[in-house]
Curated annotation (Swiss-Prot):
It catalyses: S-ubiquitinyl-[E2 ubiquitin-conjugating enzyme]-L-cysteine + [acceptor protein]-L-lysine = [E2 ubiquitin-conjugating enzyme]-L-cysteine + N(6)-ubiquitinyl-[acceptor protein]-L-lysine. Residues 441-453 have a biased composition (Basic residues). The keyword Ribosomal protein does not apply. This is E3 ubiquitin-protein ligase arkadia-A. Coiled coil: none annotated. Zn(2+) binds at residues 871, 874, 894, 897. Monomer. SUPFAM superfamilies: RING/U-box. It is found in: Nucleus; Cytoplasm; Nucleus, PML body. The lineage of its organism: Eukaryota, Metazoa, Chordata, Craniata, Vertebrata. It comes from Xenopus laevis. E3 ubiquitin-protein ligase required for mesoderm patterning during embryonic development by enhancing signaling of the subset of TGF-beta factors responsible for the formation of dorso-anterior tissues of Spemann's organizer. Acts as an enhancer of the transcriptional responses of the smad2/smad3 effectors, which are activated downstream of BMP. Acts by mediating ubiquitination and degradation of SMAD inhibitors such as smad7, inducing their proteasomal degradation and thereby enhancing the transcriptional activity of TGF-beta and BMP. A zinc finger (RING-type) spans 871-912. InterPro entries: RNF111_N (IPR029306), Znf_RING (IPR001841), Znf_RING/FYVE/PHD (IPR013083), ZNRF3_Arkadia_E3_ligases (IPR051073).
Length: 923
């Protein structure tokens, strides 16, 4: 402990200064993902490096999170933390715009809550640094959840300049550190089964938050509430739960040094290894932990905010994760035993999430990989696994995004199946399943979004929503995603765009999936993923749960991503946002707030990868109905997103749709309408782009909304639409899509009731937008099968995308032929009148022969050309008696040859003199 303490103090000093750099340590979230059940979701916003390196910083930052309700920078950092818990979410949300009443009300909710707030305020870290996920987790962990599971709305910590924690806090941290270390060591020994310790296995989720850099990070996410004595969800750990999950490939082993520092109300995350810190150093907000917690956070997560300390190397996708998590609200932690099985995939997802920015695509791939593993796990575990899967996806994604794309399709399928299996499955497995696709799209997109949002507004992973909680608790820990996504924390309005993104992930299983992608607020992945996941959750779980989680994720994403991919997010917004409001209208509002602030950050993420955001898939729509109720809140964000994403319309389209979705959920129909307009504009922009690349449009048929959305919006970027569209529900969705398009209500096929009101004005535009940007180009191939799409494409820009070209082109050709013959060609009568046809006769045959002979005698070889004439059209020598035609220019050709030429061109083939210009010389 002393060693750790010393190291932590040393590293903390360094980390405090290099919060951003430390962000990269989030990669440990891969392992963290293993604890999918643990609702602890770290957002990509959280930087693993920051988390680890910021052990002290984390602690301080936790205070900050509490004290900085409206600090964009803090929001970014806290964004990841928020995902871990409502408290985190509030602190995390801390997005400037997102101040939550709960934050203020809940400071006293739990003992740690107040100290935490105070310490957070004392610290006041700049969120822009994107505090490490761990730190975020530490700061706004469960204590809030335990007390009230603060909604996103409650203000997070205000930025506090002081980054030093009081002596008392330090002592507490040391005690907690020792305690956690013991627990961690114990669990470390139990690595294989550590996942089973259901103590808020946020470690996996935290792992997700950890940066996706290659570094292995250990996320220690001690719940300050744990210190308060809140019973651990899964109990073996008293105040703090230290879950060290070792994936098949333990990440921590290499970096065994695990420094966990936490004060009673604050948790400090100590970098497990230098690598981890470097990750944190990266300073890229990660939404990984959001992913991780998504699955991991089951109903428990929903019902409780938890402070988690996750010690987990992010670098290695599969790594032990030390999850110190306590849900103040829900002492019981969903066991992550099954999740443990999923630990590696989760780790990957975590990594993926952390890499969301840079490894968005990878994320998808990893997710895809993780997904396969998840299916094996039992339903209950599925939630955890889903979380793990997300984490895993993140991790894998960090390693390679490409795989995600293939996974994406599989994810979609799983989406469909998982949705059916059980809430837990839906939230967990489907999330994982869908997560990869979203991860894939969104990773690019999401990655960008996340990146974008983070810079401007660190993602606030813990964006739990108490509302979400309700939905989240639907059936088993629909977990991971649902419980963690739906966590009150998730709904932190403060979670800025990024925060919201993460929140979405955390809020519900659906969102959880989305979160991984959605970590990048603007990232289509984020939104997209959330969408996909949300759809599953909504579909199979309770729409409420899915919607709740989804909404959070969507909303969270919407805020940050809109700028990145306004259209995409918008599209998603309809789907995602709508579900979100159900449980989190405030969240929606936060999105709006976030949207306002995030627009600047999102622009950076024009992530073609986001294309894969296909995850937006109509799944989002499923939750939409619930979302619609709360949608009115975020009208502003849509515009921001749209404007921000306007430029990278294609990529942003998906993200934008998602974002839009989120916003819409937050925003009301008004926002939806606004989005619709924005979307239409963007669609037009995209369309123009697409017009430039008509072939692509033809290449990409939009089989279903999934494809039509992020991917399709991004279509020209990723073009994984085929793969993605190969999702099992592609067929059904496609029909739904067609119906929606035909009816003009994009959401109609996917949801009914309120959604229509909100979505009708907005949704159709997003869809149209997608169609135009991604779908039109994509749809051109099968446009014949989708007349409504064709109409949309033609209606959007006032002309048919395909028909006009076809008809006009043919007409032009015919016209050219007609005009060409008249203008350029000559009639047979004109030819006969202007030329001199006759039988060829070698006039100078004798002379030529004599000359030839003479030349030979002189030893000079006379060229035959001099003695013989050739038809320059057929290049044959003119023979005696052949029908030839002499033109006014005196050039001689075979009649057959020259007549064919003159029919198309009245000019001499040799000198280009018009036969009409001179009188024929018939002599």
């Amino acid at each position: 402990v002393e060693m750790i303490a010393s190291k932590v103090s040393n590293e903390f000093n360094h980390l405090c200064s290099d919060t951003n750099k430390q962000q990269s340590d989030l990669n440990s979230n891969g392992t963290e993902q293993d604890k999918s059940l643990v609702v602890h979701k770290k957002r990509k916003s959280q930087q693993a490096g920051t988390s680890y390196a910021q052990s002290c910083e984390v602690k301080e930052y936790q205070r900050l999170l509490r004290l900085q309700p409206k600090s964009d920078e803090d929001n970014d950092s806290s964004f990841s933390d928020c995902i871990s818990s409502p408290s985190s979410s509030s602190h995390f949300g801390d997005s400037d715009t997102m101040t939550s009443d709960e934050d203020k009300d809940n400071p006293l909710s739990s003992v740690n809550s107040t100290p935490r707030t105070q310490s957070a305020r004392a610290q006041k870290w700049p969120r822009p640094h994107t505090d490490s996920v761990s730190s975020l987790l530490m700061k706004r962990p469960c204590y809030q959840v335990s007390s009230l599971r603060r909604p996103l709305h409650r203000k997070r910590f205000v930025k506090n300049v002081s980054s030093q924690r009081t002596q008392k806090q330090k002592e507490r941290i040391m005690l907690q550190r020792k305690k956690r270390e013991v627990l961690a060591r114990q669990k470390y020994a139990l690595l294989p089964s550590s996942s089973s310790s259901s103590e808020n296995d946020l470690s996996s989720e935290s792992s997700s938050s950890s940066s996706t850099e290659g570094e292995e990070d250990l996320f220690v996410s001690p719940g300050e509430n744990h210190q308060d004595g809140t019973t651990l969800p899964s109990g073996g750990m008293d105040e703090d739960v230290v879950v060290i999950e070792a994936s098949s490939t333990p990440q921590v082993t290499a970096n065994e040094e695990i420094n966990v520092t936490s004060t009673d109300s604050e948790v400090e995350i100590v970098t497990v290894g230098e690598t981890y810190r470097s990750r944190a150093t990266l300073g890229h907000p990660r939404s990984h932990w959001g992913q991780n917690s998504q699955s991991g956070r089951t109903q428990e997560q929903r019902t409780r905010n938890r402070v988690s300390t996750i010690i987990q190397p992010l670098r290695q996708n599969t790594t032990e994760v030390v999850d110190l998590t306590v849900d103040e609200d829900d002492p019981t932690v969903v066991p992550t035993t099954s999740g443990r099985v999923e630990s590696q995939p989760v780790s990957i997802v975590s990594s993926l999430t952390s890499t969301s920015e840079p490894a968005s695509d990878s994320m998808s791939g990893l997710m895809g990989s993780a997904v396969p593993e998840i299916p094996a796990i039992p339903p209950n575990t599925v939630g955890t696994i889903a979380d793990d899967s997300r984490t895993c996806t993140s991790g894998a994604n960090a390693d390679g995004g490409p795989p995600a794309m293939p996974r994406l399709p599989s994810c979609c399928p799983q989406h469909s199946p998982c949705g059916g299996s059980s809430q837990n499955h839906v939230l967990g497995h489907p999330h994982s399943s869908c997560f990869p696709p979203h991860s894939h799209h969104f990773p690019h997109h999401h990655h960008h979004h996340h990146h974008s949002s983070h810079p401007g507004v660190p993602l606030s992973p813990s964006f739990r929503d108490s509302h979400c909680t309700v939905e989240r608790n639907a059936a088993v820990p629909p977990p991971c995603g649902v419980s963690s996504s739906s966590g009150s924390t998730y709904h932190d309005p403060q979670a800025l765009p990024v925060d919201l993104s993460n929140n979405g992930i955390r809020s519900h299983g659906s969102v959880g999936f989305h979160s991984t992608s959605a970590f990048d607020p603007c990232c289509p992945g984020s939104s997209s993923r959330s969408t996909v996941y949300g759809h599953q959750a909504t579909t199979s779980t309770a729409q409420t749960m899915a919607i709740d989680g989804y909404g959070s994720s969507m909303v969270a994403q919407a805020q940050p991503p809109p700028p990145l991919s306004s259209c995409r997010h918008y599209m998603h917004a309809s789907y995602t946002s709508l579900p979100r409001p159900l449980h989190h209208q405030t969240s929606s509002c936060p999105h709006s707030n976030s949207a306002s602030q995030p627009p600047p950050p999102p622009p950076p993420p024009p992530p073609p990868p986001m294309d894969y955001v296909i995850a937006h898939q109509v799944p989002f729509i499923s939750p939409l109905p619930s979302l619609t109720s709360t949608h009115a809140v975020p009208p502003p964000p849509p515009s921001h997103h749209l404007s921000a994403a306007a430029a990278p319309l294609p990529q942003h389209l998906s993200t934008s749709h998602q974002s839009m979705s989120h916003h819409i959920s937050a925003t009301a129909p008004a926002t939806q309408r606004l989005h619709a307009h924005e979307v239409i504009q963007r669609m037009e922009v995209q369309r123009r782009r697409m017009m430039q690349h008509p072939t692509r449009a033809h290449e990409r048929p939009p089989p279903h909304p999934h494809r039509m959305h992020p991917n399709y919006g991004h279509g020209h970027h990723i073009h994984v639409p085929q793969t993605m569209s190969s999702h099992p529900r592609q067929g059904p969705e496609r029909s739904a899509w067609e119906i929606a398009i035909e009816t003009g209500v994009t959401a109609a096929p996917y949801q009914t009731g309120p959604l229509h009101t909100h979505l009708a004005p907005y949704h159709p535009p997003p869809r149209l937008h997608h169609l135009q940007i991604g779908a039109l180009p994509l749809m051109v191939p099968d446009m014949a099968g989708y007349p409504h799409i064709r109409y949309i494409s033609s209606g959007l820009d006032g002309r048919s995308f395909r028909v006009p070209f076809r008809g006009n082109f043919e007409e032009l050709i015919h016209l050219e032929e007609r005009l060409g013959n008249v203008n350029r060609g000559a009639s047979q009568g004109t030819i006969e009148r202007c030329t001199y046809p006759h039988k060829y006769k070698k006039v100078s045959t004798d002379w030529f022969s004599q000359r030839k002979l003479h030349s030979k005698q002189d030893g000079e070889e006379a060229p035959e050309e001099d003695t013989e004439e050739k038809c320059t059209i057929c290049l044959s020598i003119l023979e005696e008696g052949e029908d030839v035609r002499r033109l006014p220019c005196m050039h001689l050709f075979h009649q057959v040859c020259v007549d064919q030429w003159l029919i198309t061109n009245k000019k001499c083939p040799i000198c280009r003199v018009d036969i009409d210009t001179q009188l024929p010389t018939e002599s």
